[in-house]
C-alpha cells in the first residue's frame, strides 16, 4: 500500500480532529519511538538469523 502526500494529509487532518492540537505532538513522538524500537528489534533479529545461517553453512562444509 503506497501512501501518497494526499493520503498523509488526510490522515493528519483526521488525527487533528480526533485528538486535538494538544495531544497530536505527543502521539507523534510515541509513534516515532515505537517505530524506532520496532526497527531495532527487527534489525537484531535479522542479524541473528544471518549469523545462524552462516554458522550452519560452515558446519555443513566440514
Swiss-Prot record:
Membrane-spanning parts: 8-28
Keyword Transmembrane helix (UniProt): yes
Alphabetized UniProt keyword annotations: Cell membrane, Membrane, Protein transport, Translocation, Transmembrane, Transmembrane helix, Transport
Disulfide bonds: none
A GO BP annotation: protein transport by the Tat complex
Key word Transmembrane present: yes
Topological category with respect to the lipid bilayer: Single-pass membrane protein
Family: Belongs to the TatA/E family.
Function: Part of the twin-arginine translocation (Tat) system that transports large folded proteins containing a characteristic twin-arginine motif in their signal peptide across membranes. TatA could form the protein-conducting channel of the Tat system.
Protein name (record): Sec-independent protein translocase protein TatAc
GO cellular component: TAT protein transport complex
NCBIfam families: PRK14861.1, tatAE
Amino acid at each position: 500500500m503506497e501512501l501518497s502526500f494526499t493520503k498523509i494529509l488526510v490522515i493528519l487532518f483526521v488525527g487533528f480532529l480526533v485528538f486535538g492540537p494538544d495531544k497530536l505532538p505527543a502521539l507523534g513522538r510515541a509513534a516515532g519511538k515505537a517505530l524506532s524500537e520496532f526497527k531495532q528489534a527487527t534489525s537484531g533479529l535479522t542479524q541473528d538469523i544471518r549469523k545462524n545461517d552462516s554458522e550452519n553453512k560452515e558446519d555443513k562444509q566440514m
